[in-house]
Amino acid sequence: AIAANVGGTITMIGTPPNVIVTGALATAGLPTFGFFEFAYIGIPLSVIILVWMLTIGRRMLPAHNAGEMDEEAVQAAKEEAGASDDKAPKSKTKMWISGLIMVGVVVCMALELPTVPLQTAAVTGAILCVITGCLKEKEAYAGIDWVTIFLFAGMLSVATAMEKTGAGKLIADTVVGMMGANPSPYLLTAVLFLISNVLTQFMSNTASAALLAPIGISIAQEVGCDPKPVLMALGIAASMAFATPMATPPNTLVLGPGNFTFNDYVKVGVPLCLISWVACVIIIPIFWPFH
């Protein structure tokens, strides 16, 4: 579960918050993140957490006997995570075709071709999967994460409304004012990371990113710094959902089989959240300077 959460931060499509913060920048008319740009923070973060879990962190892991599989809970978590039916027969030909389609889509996204935008590459790949028979139409429809789509669409409207009405500036002025005159961008980034990270433990990481992304842009513009490092911190913080079983589908999926308790997640997750917080505050400004 920990590896799934951290590994998703390496690419734009690895986790919904990455897409959300990229869309927020595009809506504001600002330069956006590239497909693999998230790897600059995602890979170091993955290595740091891997080393921690292999050394000190493993001592914190619970040593429970395996629990009984709650099939309903597992199936619900799989559906939320977009997993396919394990009992369906597998076709090697379709596996190769779908693999080639995925490689083609990723290459197009990585090259950032002006004639093939990210959304065009993604939709084309999905259509090819249906045309080639790798997916049935109903399976493709069921695989769409409607929550993310509607949250993303709603976020665009909210961001525009906050800009037009001045609500974004009001919130930014309030937050900045609480930190004194001329607050450091490092301090702002650290505080916003904590807010996003705490929220994502108790609500969808997609929702927390959608809620804070427009506010993060307003705050960055208020203090005169580049919004990209602030948005990157918000997005990564929303994906560092380790401390509760309901934070992300991977956490929920292993709850029953691992026979874990709520306190197990807190014991293992809180140190990981603090480590990721310190690492991001140090690493993010290196690749995305504030000025």
Task: Locate predicted features.
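Cytoplasmic-side transmembrane-helix entry/capping segments in multi-pass membrane proteins
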Residues: 1-2, 142-151, 208, 212
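Hydrophobic alpha-helical segments of integral membrane proteins
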Residues: 2, 143-144, 167, 171-179, ...
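Hydrophobic alpha-helical transmembrane segments of multi-pass integral membrane proteins
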Residues: 12, 181-219, 223, 227, ...
